[in-house]
Amino acid sequence: MSKKDCILAIDQGTTSTRSIVFGKDAQALAISRREFPQHYPELGWVEHDVEDIWRDVLATARETIEEVGGPERIAALGITNQRETIVIWDRETGRAIHRALVWQDRRTAHECNLLRQQGKEAMVREKTGLLLDPYFSASKIAWLLDHVPDARRRAEAGELAAGTIDSFLLWRLTGGKRHATDITNACRTSLFNIHTQEWDEELLKLFNVPRALLPEVCDNSSDFGETEAKLFGEKIAIGGMAGDQHAAVIGQACFHEGMAKATYGTGCFMLLNTGEKPIMSNNRLLTTIAYRIGGKTFYALEGSIFVAGAGIKWLRDGLKLITHASQTDDMATRIPDSHGVYMVPAFVGLGAPHWDPDSRGLICGLTLGSTQAHIARAMLESVAYQTYDLIRAMREDGAMRTSILRIDGGMAVNDWFAQFLSSMLKAEVERPVNIETTALGAAFLAGLQVGLWKSLDEVTATWKQERVFAPKMDPAQRRIMIDGWHDAVRRTLTPSAPVAHSSVETTASQAA
C-alpha cells in the first residue's frame, strides 16, 4: 500500500479552478487548471453557474490525483475559494436555485445605501468588521430569497441551504452529509459576529435571512468529513477550508502580529496580521478574522482592491492590446514611464479605502504620443498605487509597523511590477519560491488536521524566499507620480462616496 504523503488542494477562484497536489516539502507535484465562463446578465451583475465550477473541481482534482499515482497517496484534501460569492441550493437535490452571485456583483448597492441612510452601518461594522457594501454576502442572500419564486418560504421551511463556494463544494463532495463552512468564509457574509464568533441574530434580522439556511461554522483545520468514494476512487478526508485571502496568509506563513501579505489575483487583497485582538480601522479598512486553528483566533486588517489581474484580462479580452498577460512586463519595460497616462480601474467601483460602488473606470492623460505600452503600463501602475493607498491607511491606523510585504498571485511573477511596487511603497517586497500560496495555505490546513505537518512552526520552515525587491525610485519623482494618481482618483469618485480619513485629499508628499 502506498504511503499517504500528499495533500490535494482545491483552489476555486473567480475566473478559474485549480487543483494542486503538494508533498510534505510544500512543493507542487501536480497542477491542473480550468477557466470557466462569467455571466453578466445586466450592468453591474456578475454570476457563476455552480455546475461549471463543480465540473471543473472534479476534472482538475482527478487529473492531479492520477498524475501522482492515485488516491492512495492523498492524506487529505483542503479547499480554498473566492470569498463572499453566494449560492443557495435545494437540500434534497443539491441543485442551485439560481446562479451564484459573485463578490463583484453590485445589484444590491441600492439596498446597502438604504441601510446606510438608516444609520445601520455602525452596528454592522462593530459586529462584523465590515462595511455596508454589496461586496459582502448578506444582501445577496436577501436578493435571491426575494427574487427567486418561492425561495423565502422554502428557506424558512428548511428546504434550502446557503453558503459560500466552499460550503457548496463540501456539500457536493460529501454527498450532502455536511453543511459547514470555516470561520474565515463565515466572517465575510455580514451575518457573523467576529467577537462572539457566531451567527448574529440582530444581523440576521437586519438582512432578513433565516438562520435555517446557514451552515455550521468550524475552525480552519477541522474534520469536515470525507469525500464520497465514487468521486476519486476512495474516500479522502477533508481537513481544511479557508477563504482565498486567508489561505494565502497561511501559505505565506504570516503567523505573527505585524506580518503582511498581498495577493494579486483577479483583485488584490492585502491582509495584515493584528494578533489576537481585532483592530477597528479609522480609514475604512476591513477588520476580519485571519484564521482560527485549535480554537485560537488571529485577526487581520484587510484592504480590498477589486481589479488587479482582472485589469490585465480586460487589456487582453476587452481592448485586445495583448494576447497573453506576460506581455505587459515587456511593454512596461520598453518605455521609460507612462507618459502621464493614468488608469483608474474602477470597473466595478472602488474598494478600500474609498468604498465607492458607483465610481467607474477612467483613463486620463492621453496625448497623440500615447501608445498601447503606455496604457498597459498605466494598468500595472494602478495596482501598485492602490496598494500604496492601502498601506498608507494601515500606517495611519497604527497597525502597519513592518517595512516588508510578502506578495503572491499571478501578477507577482512580473518582475517590473514587483520592482515598481517596492518603489511606490518604500518597502521591501518579498516574493516566495512558491507563489501558489492560496492553494498551499489550504494544503497546510488540511495537512495540520491529519498530522502531515505537526505545527505552525513546521509550516513556517517550508517558506522560502525567491527574490526580494528594494525601492529604487527618486523620492521627488515618486511623490509627483502618486499625486498624479490621486488627482485621477478624485475624478472618478461620486459626490456621495464616503471619504476615509486616509483620503485622496491628503497629498502624497504629506503622507509619504
From Swiss-Prot:
GO terms for molecular function: ATP binding; glycerol kinase activity. Glycerol binds at R83, E84, Y135, D244, Q245. ADP binds at T14, R18, T266, G309, G410, N414. Inhibited by fructose 1,6-bisphosphate (FBP). Sn-glycerol 3-phosphate binds at T14, R83, E84, Y135, D244. NCBIfam families: glycerol_kin, PRK00047.1. This is Glycerol kinase. It comes from Gluconobacter oxydans (strain 621H). The gene is glpK.
